Amino acid sequence: MGGNQSQPNATAIIGTGKGGPLDTSAGTIASRGISFTYDHAAEPALRDITLTVPAGECIVLCGASGCGKTSYTRVANGLIPSFFHGAFAGNQTTCGLDVETVPIDRLTPLVGSVFQNPKTQYFNANVTDELAFPAENIGLPAEDINRRITAVAERFGIGHLLHRSIFHLSGGQKQRIAVAAATMLGPRLVVLDEPTSNLDANAIADMRAMIEQMKDEGLTIVIAEHRLAWLNGVADRYVVFDGGHIVQDYEADEFLSLSPGCVAAMGLRALDLQPYRRRIAALASSPAADECTSALLGTHNLTIGYKGKDGFTRAIPDLRFRAGEITGLMGNNGCGKTTLVRTLTGLIKPVSGRIELNGVPAKPRDLTRAGFLIMQDVNYQLFSDSVREELLIGLDETDAGITAQANQVMADLDLAAFAERHPMSLSGGQKQRVAIGSALMCGKDLIIFDEPTSGLDRYHMEQVGELLRQLASQGKAILVVTHDEELAAGWCDRIVNLGADDSGNNGSHVSNPDASSPSPNASTNFATTSTHERNAQ
């Protein structure tokens, strides 16, 4: 591991033991009149932000996509203006240091950052190496690094993940490793940007436990987040952004007492998921859909998975997906949801059984031609240099009708302003909408969405729901893989709950539905239900 380079203040900054006793006197964020415009951007991302965060406090930054939450996290951790360049005004001190004048390596040991997509911050393929990386970077001796790895693993309960390949971890496990790595240097401040956007209920519970642990140790915590319900009882303050401004700064009790209507009017996600969970539980106790109705796609004695020594397999009860119907596929990470949709779209072959299209046995290539899959990580399927070109891939750009359709899709998805922007320059939520736009342009009969509302605010989540309904009304069969209980309760006609078995293994066990389960995402049952009601209340 790394050698002992000259770092005179490293020991004082980092402490001892499990991160050491924290000197929280410098763990304050102070922003005074902060404004920032990214290079080549027409409008400021932040406008006259004044905010103070006392040491040891946990604050939540919330608001619609593009409101300035992520930009402010970059100011708080010093990435603006040292890494993201543009016009910066105001005064920002983080952990007692002026971010405009202090070298970024002075801030590094004091601030831990966790980004929305943990893949963007990994430097190693092995969990242990990833945890060691921050300490190696500042030249700590190998003995100290090993001690820190042991302490962090014990603190966050991740000892069983040490030495494993990061590529073999679930989304929740990857995010836990990212948080653990961010605390390796004993920071005074931890900044998290939408840490639960891709997580299921169990993984969110793990994330909450990590936040509580850090808060108990006296760390200052800043979380930019759309999904708010999981933070009840953890956050001390909620700061609402809009158009680059801070429009409200609530104490937790005041914020949690707001009516659902007031929360919705601010464009925020629900603070209480119980009405949505009751809705899904009610669906889980409803009769199955009419089996006499013809299905666009059906499965018979299907087993999905991967062959080999460490292969995953799962038996799937017979399913039917009908034109004009929105089916929600729910369940914990690792239960086989993504494997199932890849099988249904012909990307991988089933282990056994068959899949039918319009009652006729289908080969994988037939399924590929019939369906369109929007992947969970849309970065893998964005290829063009502009949003407009992305929507027109494979289509005749000289056809006025197709061009008009693309313009309408961009307008419907609130993407018209980004028509000439490179897709990779957009936010996570905007990229999701570009991929949804591609699905609307493809004209196929089966459209499968893998976590389409990941990273989306309330307005755009509801917009996705409306688009799903629009597609269904056009006779499309829609399958939505989702952890989003608001989306599932409000917009799905049927729910398929695909959970792990009672022993926690993701195998072939299927049990009867338990309608009393408080959280459909945390259920260990498999249930299919049907309804045409979409009132989450």
Q: Predicted segment positions?
A:
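The feature captures the beta-strand-to-loop junction immediately N-terminal to the Walker
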Residues: 62-64, 330-332
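Conserved ABC transporter NBD signature motif
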Residues: 85-97, 353-367
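Conserved ABC ATPase signature
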Residues: 165-169, 173, 422-426, 430
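Catalytic Walker B motif of ABC-type/P-loop ATPase nucleotide-binding domains
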Residues: 190-193, 447-450
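Conserved ABC ATPase "signature" region
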Residues: 143-161, 401-418
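Helix-to-loop junction immediately C-terminal to a conserved catalytic motif
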Residues: 77, 345
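ABC ATPase C-loop
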Residues: 182-183, 440
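H-loop/switch region of ABC-family ATPase nucleotide-binding domains
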Residues: 225-226, 482-483
